[in-house]
A protein has these predicted regions:
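Terminal accessory/targeting
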Residues: 1-69, 86-96, 208-264
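Short low-complexity, flexible loop/linker segments enriched in glycine and/or proline
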Residues: 111-113, 137-139, 196-197, 254-259
Length: 264
């Protein structure tokens, strides 16, 4: 059974802010301070307990906070992933990384850094094979093997799964043992590694509750990610992990179920 990592009770956090704002609806506005030039610690309100309520508000048109999840597949690759982590740290942004098992060796410190800096870590199989049609034994060699490697590094096994290519079947749902995360925005950054095109496609498609798919193994994608963050910050978006996105919307993540977005 999927056991969620021990995060704060987001509903209670949001409810507390709602009371401070005098909100009576089930959805309460998320309060966040945004000092220029970039948002500092987007997810701080969602991750830090006991902090003072910040001063300014970022909401969508119906009063809900505009949340979006940035996710990266196929890492870790030391050169590009560490550069990405540096830039995300400068911007106070949390992301979700779906990792390849065979690339974990000699990158354990990179994975620990992800976890320590508040990012979410997930499974992207051992060597990026299609999971459809696999026997339980072969499926476990891809997913459970990677899960165990991550557990050895991080000390827990609360990981989401993203199947390569986003291809699904009933066998994956039966065997996953955890929630399955797809996406709602795919700029196909792997195709031509065109930074400008990727940025424009993501920014023009951005929507409250979206999950963005990118890859942290291309320098062009790393550059694009920074530009996307900076531009969407200007539009009032808050970047959170996948689990934070669903928890803030009071949407449960269940083992064997597939999720592509958390649209209001």
């Amino acid at each position: 059974m999927f056991r969620r990592k021990s995060y704060p009770d987001w509903a209670a956090v949001l409810a507390a802010f709602g009371l401070l704002l005098g909100a009576a609806a089930p959805w309460f506005a998320l309060v966040l301070s945004i000092p220029p030039p970039a948002v500092q610690a987007d997810a701080q309100v969602l991750t830090d307990e006991g902090g003072e309520p910040p001063s300014s508000q970022v909401r969508s048109g119906d009063g809900q906070p505009k949340l979006i999840a940035l996710t990266f597949d196929d890492g870790p690759r030391r050169s590009t992933t560490t550069a990405l982590l540096d830039g995300l740290a400068e911007r106070g942004v949390k992301a979700t990384f779906f990792l390849i098992g065979e690339q974990l060796e000699n990158n354990e410190d990179v994975v620990r850094r992800m976890d320590e800096e508040g990012h979410q870590v997930g499974i992207h199989t051992f060597d990026h094979v299609r999971l459809t049609g696999l026997s339980k034994v072969d499926f476990d060699a891809q997913v459970d093997r990677t899960r165990q490697l991550l557990k050895n590094i991080l000390g827990h096994n609360d990981f989401l799964l993203r199947p390569p290519y986003g291809i699904m079947d009933d066998g994956i749902r039966r065997h996953a043992g955890c929630p399955i995360i797809l996406w709602s925005i795919d700029p196909e950054d792997w195709k031509d590694q065109n930074t400008a095109r990727v940025v424009e496609q993501v920014v023009s498609s951005a929507r409250d509750g979206a999950i963005i798919l990118m890859h942290d193994i291309f320098p062009e994608s790393v550059d694009a990610a920074f530009q996307i963050v900076d531009r969407l910050h200007q539009q009032g978006y808050l970047f959170v992990t996948v689990e934070q996105l669903f928890a803030a919307r009071c949407l449960p993540l269940e083992a064997g179920q597939t999720y592509s977005d958390a649209y209001p």
